[in-house]
Every structure is written in structure tokens, then in C-alpha cells.
């Protein structure tokens, strides 16, 4: 990870970014090969294409509900001195073991149960990973470091993915079944995730924290109760979270359900996977560009640009019927995906108390990190009610419009120092 210009990453910042490289491989698997694995099991179980898309969406929503309950609780406990790293390790362990175990499922229902466990572990780890940003860098460097995290996550995750894709597409030529190839792909992804996590575990130290008290867990519940009661008083945080809930729900729905959407439309599997690989490649320089732009323009100006672009993406997806259109969609998503994620993370990190970063990022996670609730429900319900996947995905434009308006409101409530 060579740096250009005057900006130089510290060793700790590089190790923090490296975790993004690891967990992003799992994200890419969830967006590409895991839905194909589930589709094969669903077909053998007699599910229709519409039922397949609907169940995938409902499971994604279930993950978000579980994570929404656990994240603020665990995040608040993790703010206590010495707690953040152990809980982070636990979540990573659950995610990695779940990733390995998915390959053992022989029916669609057990597969979904294991997937929920793995995704909850993954989503939980992101609460603590994101909250570490205030410990690994300074406020003036957050936009750039956060953007580089997403950028290297996108391009770094392509390394195991290309190998996994080669295994799946070339399974017959090397004498193994496609299901065996998918099992190997899951194991490879888990190994990559583990190896890229170790440097952060070795170097990270919790700098901002709440001192250890008697009955730490009970006190953590008291702190989060106090924060929730008084959250509306901090208007810059309150209105941002409302806006973030809407627009990031749409973003993560597109990420999580892209392959399932294309499959439901009957598009070629190989073309879909290669198009999503292009998304990762395009997202790498795009995220870096947004990081550089953040040195010149405040995130309050850049985030609305990304939201507006996603509204256009939802409209385009409504009319999508052919594979070449999916390729265009993949490129456009790649241009703005990293920017909206990275800038939202760093924007939030700068407006919250650093010693309560775990607690606040638990709330941040509820609003859509890892998997989306409202967005996936909109897509699933819309698809089932109309019999058209296009209508379901196109309906996401509502989330982006509302998110755009609420974000502008949040910026007017109080100027956020950049």
C-alpha cells in the first residue's frame, strides 16, 4: 500500500485498513457466490425464482434485526476500558467459523441459518472496527484514512475472489463438482479474513474509553439508555442518523441483493460475477478520489452527490432487462459505493464523543451497516406483490430521496467542523 504525495499512513492505520481487505472478501462472497450456492440449494428444494429472491431478502432483514438488538449493547460494553478488542475478536471468530460451516449445509434452510450466524458475527465486528477509527487516527485524517480503508478493501478482496471464481467456473476442468468448488471458496475466504485480521489484533490499543466500573455490563445499559433519551438533543447526530438510516439502507440493499436480483432476471451467472468484479475494481480508484476530494471539499458537500447518484442508479435498475445494462450498473455503483460509505463513516466519527465511539457506532450499525432491513423488505415485498424484481429494486429511490432531504436538514442544524 504505497502512498503518494504528502499523506503517509502510519503502521497502525495500515493494519486497520488491512482488516477492511479481509472482511471485504466475505462481503464480496455474500454479494456473488453465496447467493449462487443458496440458489442451487433452493432449486433442489423446489423454490421458485421469486421465492428464492424473497427468502434471501427476508434473511438479510433478519440479520439486521438481530444485529440491531446486539450492536448498541455490545458497543456500549466495548467502550469500557479493555473490552473492545476481546468483543471484536469474538465477533470475528463467529463470522469466520460461520463462513467455513456454510459449506457443510446440504439443504437451503440449514444453509440460511448458518448464513445468519456468520453475517451477525461479521456485522458485529464492523461495529467495533468502525469505532476503532478514533483510536487509530486523528480527526483531520479520518476522511482520507476511512476512504483508503474502503478502497483497499475493494481491490484487496479481489485477490481471493478471483481464485474462488476460478475454482467455481473451472470446477469441471479440475475434476471437482461446483458444490465442492463453492465449499473450497468459502474456506479460502475464511482463511483470508483471518490472516488479514491478525496485524490489527497485534497492534491495536484502545485509547478512548470509559473507566472500568463495578457492574460494568449494568452500567453499560444505563449509559446507552441515557444516550438514547438525550440523542434528539444532539441535533447534528440525531438528524444524520435518520438520514443515514434511509440512504445507506438503499446502498446496502443494492450491494447485498445485486447477484440475487440479476439471477431472478435470468441473467448469465458468469457475466454477473465478472460485472461485480468490475464494481470492485472501479470502486478502488473512486474511493481514493473521494478521499482526496475530502481534503478540498467537506463531507457535507460530497455525501449528497453520492446519494443523488444512487437515486439515479435505482431508476436505471427499474428498466434493467439485459446483461450489458447490468455491466453499466456495476460500473456506476463502483464509482459512488466507496465514497458514500467511507465519508459517512468518517463524518459520523468526527461528530461523536470519541470515548463513546463503540456505543455510537452501535447506533450507526443499526441504521444499516452490513445488511439492510427496510430496503430488503421493500425489494422482497415489491417483488412478491408485483411478480417483478424490477419494481422492487426501483422502489429504492424513495429511500434515497428521503435520505438526501434529511441529510441536508442535519447539515443545517449545526456546522460540523471538517
Task: Please report, for each region that a protein language model flagged, where it lies by residue.
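Helix-to-loop junctions at the C-terminal end of transmembrane segments
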Residues: 69-83, 285-298, 383
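Structural signature of the two symmetry-related core transmembrane helices
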Residues: 86-101, 301-316
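Glycine-rich segments within core transmembrane alpha-helices of 12-TM secondary carriers
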Residues: 146-168, 365-375
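Multi-pass alpha-helical transporter architecture, strongest
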Residues: 192-203, 394-418
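A membrane-interface helix-boundary motif in multi-pass transporters
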Residues: 49-50, 168-191, 381-400
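Juxtamembrane intracellular "pre-TM" segments in multi-pass secondary transporters
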Residues: 2-13, 205-242
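Helix-loop junctions at membrane interfaces in 12-TM secondary transporters
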Residues: 102-115, 318-330
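Helix-loop boundary and gating motifs at the non-cytosolic
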Residues: 6-64, 236-268, 272-275
Amino acid at each position: 500500500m504505497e502512498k503518494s504525495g504528502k499523506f503517509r499512513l502510519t503502521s497502525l492505520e495500515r493494519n486497520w485498513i488491512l482488516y477492511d481487505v479481509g472482511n471485504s472478501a466475505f462481503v464480496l462472497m455474500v454479494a456473488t457466490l453465496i447467493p449462487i450456492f443458496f440458489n442451487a440449494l433452493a432449486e433442489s428444494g423446489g423454490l421458485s425464482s421469486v421465492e428464492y429472491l424473497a427468502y434471501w431478502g427476508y434473511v438479510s432483514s433478519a440479520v439486521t434485526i438481530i444485529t440491531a438488538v446486539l450492536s448498541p449493547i455490545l458497543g456500549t460494553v466495548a467502550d469500557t476500558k479493555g473490552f473492545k478488542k476481546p468483543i471484536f475478536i469474538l465477533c470475528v471468530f463467529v463470522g469466520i467459523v460461520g463462513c467455513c460451516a456454510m459449506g457443510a449445509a446440504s439443504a437451503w434452510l440449514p444453509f440460511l441459518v448458518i448464513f445468519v450466524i456468520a453475517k451477525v458475527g461479521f456485522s458485529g465486528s464492523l461495529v467495533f472496527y468502525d469505532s476503532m477509527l478514533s483510536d487509530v487516527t486523528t480527526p483531520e485524517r479520518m476522511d482520507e484514512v476511512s476512504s483508503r480503508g474502503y478502497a483497499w478493501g475493494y481491490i484487496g478482496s479481489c485477490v481471493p475472489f478471483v481464485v474462488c471464481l476460478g475454482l467455481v467456473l473451472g470446477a469441471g476442468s479440475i475434476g471437482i463438482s461446483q458444490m465442492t468448488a463453492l465449499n473450497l471458496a468459502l474456506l479460502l475466504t475464511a482463511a483470508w479474513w483471518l490472516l488479514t485480521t491478525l496485524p490489527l489484533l497485534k497492534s491495536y490499543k484502545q485509547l478512548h474509553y470509559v473507566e472500568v466500573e463495578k457492574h460494568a455490563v449494568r452500567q453499560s445499559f444505563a449509559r446507552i439508555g441515557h444516550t438514547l433519551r438525550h440523542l434528539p438533543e444532539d441535533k447534528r447526530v440525531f438528524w444524520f442518523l435518520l438520514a443515514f438510516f434511509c440512504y445507506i439502507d438503499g446502498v446496502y440493499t443494492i450491494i447485498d441483493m445485486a447477484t440475487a436480483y440479476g439471477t431472478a432476471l435470468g441473467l448469465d451467472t458468469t457475466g454477473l460475477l465478472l460485472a461485480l468484479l468490475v464494481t470492485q475494481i472501479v470502486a478502488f480508484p473512486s474511493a481514493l478520489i473521494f478521499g482526496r476530494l475530502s481534503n478540498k471539499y467537506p463531507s457535507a458537500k460530497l455525501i449528497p452527490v453520492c446519494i443523488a447518484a444512487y437515486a439515479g442508479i435505482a431508476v436505471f435498475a427499474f428498466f434493467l432487462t439485459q446483461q450489458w445494462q447490468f455491466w453499466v450498473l456495476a460500473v456506476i455503483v463502483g464509482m459512488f459505493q466507496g465514497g458514500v460509505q467511507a465519508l459517512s463513516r468518517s463524518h459520523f466519527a468526527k461528530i461523536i464523543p470519541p470515548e463513546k465511539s463503540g456505543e455510537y457506532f452501535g447506533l450507526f450499525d443499526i441504521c444499516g451497516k452490513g445488511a439492510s432491513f427496510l430496503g430488503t423488505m421493500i425489494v422482497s415485498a415489491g417483488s412478491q406483490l408485483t411478480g417483478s424484481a424490477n419494481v422492487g429494486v426501483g422502489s429504492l429511490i424513495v429511500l434515497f430521496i428521503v435520505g438526501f432531504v434529511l441529510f441536508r436538514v442535519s447539515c443545517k442544524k449545526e456546522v460540523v467542523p471538517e
